[in-house]
Amino acid sequence: ANARGNLFVDESCIDCDTCRWMAPSTYGRAGTKSYVHTQPEGSGDTAIALAAAVACPTGSIRTQAPEPAMRGVVESFPLPIDAARLPRVFHLGYHAATSFGATPYLLCMPDGTNAMVDAPRFSSKLAKALEARGGVQLLLLTHMDDVADHIRWKERFPAMVRVMHARDVRGPDSWPYIDMRGVERQLEGAGPWEMLPGLRAIHTPGHSAGSVSFLAEAPLCGSAEGALFTGDHFCFSGRLGRLDMSSSTLA
């Protein structure tokens, strides 16, 4: 049961884990649902717990009474992943139910190019925040499960180029029932492919036949370290307590 207080998780939770990795001091898991195990205390914990509510793909995190801090939290996205180590990599929030809560990222490169990695659910507030950063020039889709609202984002940013592997491109009559046939750059073969200097797409089949990871070298991330965006097939296992691979199906 949810801890007594203003914040709670309702029965619409789909157990995607978003809130639990974002704010583990507030959210936990019971059976196949998340719940509030401890009400947040202090402005820092409250902001993180509310950010998880914004990111929740099903809007399952609610409040008993209006939360004064919520407006500022909504306006805080995109959130830095690690301002010291990866100052140009951000968490977009606004996870989509159609991608089962997959995490979307933003890479803001030194030349002014902004790349989304996997699509969040569409939000006009997030779109305005992205416009203030110069818009979005690339949408890098790791695989077919995580395309979410890519069509609506393309409508908002018409010059944006979407990228995914041709083996994962589907029409609206196939899982996940989202039309991908209009994706501008459909990668063929085994790669790797250069998106931009310092940004490569690497074919990593397994989770799906067309799964692709995107490697951004250190200069693009603004630090001494690069970033590898892997989609769903590489994850942290809470059960095992370590990094692990999702089940291989089409290696």
Residue spans for each PLM region:
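Conserved small-residue-rich
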Residues: 12-13, 82-130, 134-143, 153
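Short cysteine/histidine-rich zinc-coordinating motifs and their immediately flanking basic loops
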Residues: 24-35, 66-71
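A detector for short, charged/polar N-terminal pre-domain segments
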Residues: 1-2
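Active-site HxH/HxHxD metal-binding segment of metal-dependent hydrolases
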Residues: 122-197
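Zn-dependent metallo-beta-lactamase
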Residues: 45-111, 157
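Residues that act as N-cap/strand-start positions at coil-to-secondary-structure junctions
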Residues: 99-101, 181, 187, 208
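Cysteine-centered iron-sulfur cluster-binding motifs in ferredoxin-type domains/subunits
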Residues: 7-23, 41-59
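Metallo-beta-lactamase
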Residues: 112-116, 121-124, 137-138, 160, ...
